Amino acid sequence: MNTYLDLCRFILQKGSFRNDRTNTGTKSVFGYQMRFNLEEGFPLLTTKKMNLRSIIHELLWFLKGDTNICYLVQNNVNIWNEWPYQKYQQSAFFQNETLKEFLEKIKNDPLFAIKHGNLGPVYGKQWRDFNGVDQIKFLISEIKTNPNSRRLILNSWNPPLLNQMALPPCHVLIQFYVHQGKLSLQLYQRSGDVFLGIPFNIASYSLLLMMVAQVTNLQPYEFIHTLGDAHIYSNHLAQVQTQIQRTPKKLPQMILNPDIKNIDDFKFSDFTLQNYQCDGILKGDIAV
């Protein structure tokens, strides 16, 4: 994954310090592209240990059209917890619960989860019901019947609903491309947290590419990741400096259950990662 480390080095060398919405501060560049050939292995970062379980569960959650953190919390996936908890803290229902206590209520009290666990019409809602359109169903049908189309688009940016979302989509637009029996996917990401988010996004959208390729009888080929504002938060600079000193290892292989022919039939047990060798964990706080 030298491709990713090159991005880190580029930002460290060429980036500008900027203020941001979270008041954390970033070092940032605008406009950057990375390419990952899935025939060379599954692009899961090896210069720090990645939480693949969270990546898979979040992607399945998107594909279910779900927007409530309850499923994620029940599967010990914590990447979306801060946003509904922050909203709950500002509500009249807040009784000084800690984040841990809040999550226990989400996990064990269905009515509480319905009321306080929803993120608004975020990714899953837009993927499966964009103003009445199931974009995933349409995409798969189009790839099968009209593979040369230049309209194989998945869009998460729905302007009238942005202010109802806990966080407007960062990974905004996806385009698929079919050539000689191979399927590629390009993601445009308006904003990318290079230390925490980007490695997660690379693996997630590469996995989505593999899933869609399987159910459309194509071979997964290339994931292209195009970034708008690519930034390293100021409180992640030390971790990134550590990471770029590490030597990438050979990429692992991701095996999908070959019996799955429908995108909605995938479950967590249908994914097997083989030969993953990595360096140790590098932690960093998420900016909310």
Curated annotation (Swiss-Prot):
Belongs to the thymidylate synthase family. Bacterial-type ThyA subfamily. It comes from the Bacteria. GO terms for molecular function: thymidylate synthase activity. Catalyzes the reductive methylation of 2'-deoxyuridine-5'-monophosphate (dUMP) to 2'-deoxythymidine-5'-monophosphate (dTMP) while utilizing 5,10-methylenetetrahydrofolate (mTHF) as the methyl donor and reductant in the reaction, yielding dihydrofolate (DHF) as a by-product. This enzymatic reaction provides an intracellular de novo source of dTMP, an essential precursor for DNA biosynthesis. (6R)-5,10-methylene-5,6,7,8-tetrahydrofolate binds at N51, D193, A287. GO terms for biological process: dTMP biosynthetic process; dTTP biosynthetic process; methylation. It catalyses: dUMP + (6R)-5,10-methylene-5,6,7,8-tetrahydrofolate = 7,8-dihydrofolate + dTMP. It comes from Onion yellows phytoplasma (strain OY-M). InterPro entries: Thymidate_synth/dCMP_Mease, Thymidate_synth/dCMP_Mease_dom, Thymidate_synth/dCMP_Mease_sf, Thymidylate_synthase, Thymidylate_synthase_AS. The keyword Transferase applies. Homodimer. It is found in: Cytoplasm. Its main location: cytoplasm. This is Thymidylate synthase. Its EC number is 2.1.1.45. CDD domains: TS_Pyrimidine_HMase. Pfam families: Thymidylat_synt. DUMP binds at R21, R150, R151, R190, S191, G192, D193, N201, H231, I232, Y233.
